[in-house]
Amino acid sequence: MVNVVLAGGGTAGHTSPLIATAMGLKEHGATVSCVGTPKGLEGRVIPEAGLELDMIPPVPLPRTVNADLFKVPARLTGAVRKAGEVLKRRQADVVVGFGGYVSLPAYLAAKRAKIPVVIHEQNAVPGLANKIAARFAVFVGTAFPDTPLPKAQFVGMP
């Protein structure tokens, strides 16, 4: 049986396809758990869907130069460490990410642990976490055929 950790959150745009994918994976016998942050919608909707949810600290990535930008390295380091603990405890065989604050730490923790990363990008214009991780992901699926990501393959929306 394969252990899949799904990462995504913040908005319904990330959590809805995550939940749909989780249900499909469970129907095929996978053990599924999710990782999110306390800031996003996932804290409510993922448990309501009957899925297990582990929390890690959010790492907002400021789009302008301000004081918060200088806090990112320490925040990211801590979040990657926490995500790594989750992946180890869940004995993850693969990490599937959908974007949002939680995804980048999960992707980096998976890369560090040599766990394959799979990405689903729901937007025509990809988010920052998915742009970064697409370079080392084993598969990148998109909801739109022309989404500009390395290795992108159009798969539609789950």
Please state what every model-predicted region is:
Residues 11-12, 16, 100-102, 124-128:
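Residue-level detector of alpha-helix initiation sites
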Residues 14-25:
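Short amphipathic alpha-helix
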Residues 13, 46, 99, 140:
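Residue-level signature of catalytic and energy-coupling elements of molecular machines
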Residues 31, 41, 52, 111-158:
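Active-site-proximal region of nucleotide-activated glycan assembly enzymes
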Residues 3-9, 28-78, 84, 155:
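Conserved nucleotide-sugar phosphate-binding/catalytic loop shared by glycosyltransferases and other
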